[in-house]
């Protein structure tokens, strides 16, 4: 008989799948912990944008989520700033350009 394939071509063994799920959970927890540090004011927007260029944990955070973690910034303010600056909804911190970063620092720094 032919072997039944997993949907979408995931050919992981159960051990590989478990390891990948564990790693994904660790990364999500690390991103959440970083956002808590941003929310508390321990990390500034300048620090976060700089860290996003080199740290894959920070770089994978959605830009809007980072802005919403800033003290005093909610969904509406984050969205209007992103629209004004020209940052796409799907953009992650690592993908923010230098000029966009400068404008974010000007607004929220």
Where is each model-derived feature located?
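Structure-specific DNA junction-binding interface
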Residues: 1-65, 69, 76, 80-109
